[in-house]
């Protein structure tokens, strides 16, 4: 596997949640810098040595509501 994709959303209580597509990996963080570190750590803990993907893609999803 050369890449893993995480869907990142703003948590209702603040901060971010991130979940991997196709793998059972989930983490949360208070800010973007902390999120980067936690996602890297979660990926390295999930995969055996030498099996982790070379690239981690964070796809930020944000809902925006406007009046009609």
Task: Label each residue range with its predicted role.
Residues 23-34:
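A short, exposed loop/beta-hairpin motif centered on an aromatic-Gly-Thr core
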Residues 4, 8-20:
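Short aromatic-glycine-(Arg/Gly/Cys) micro-motifs in beta-strand/loop hairpins
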Residues 13, 23, 40:
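ATP/adenylate-binding site constellation spanning eukaryotic-like Ser/Thr protein kinases
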Residues 1-5, 33, 37-68:
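Short, charged, surface-exposed hinge/linker loops at domain edges
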Residues 20-21, 51:
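Residue-level signal for pocket-adjacent positions within structured domains
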């Amino acid at each position: 596997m050369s890449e893993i994709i995480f869907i990142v959303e703003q948590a209702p209580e603040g901060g971010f949640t991130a979940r991997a597509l196709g793998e059972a990996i989930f983490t949360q963080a208070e800010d973007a810098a902390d999120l980067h570190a936690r996602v890297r750590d979660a990926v390295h803990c999930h995969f055996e040595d030498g099996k982790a993907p070379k690239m981690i893609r964070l796809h930020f999803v944000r809902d925006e509501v406007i009046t009609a």
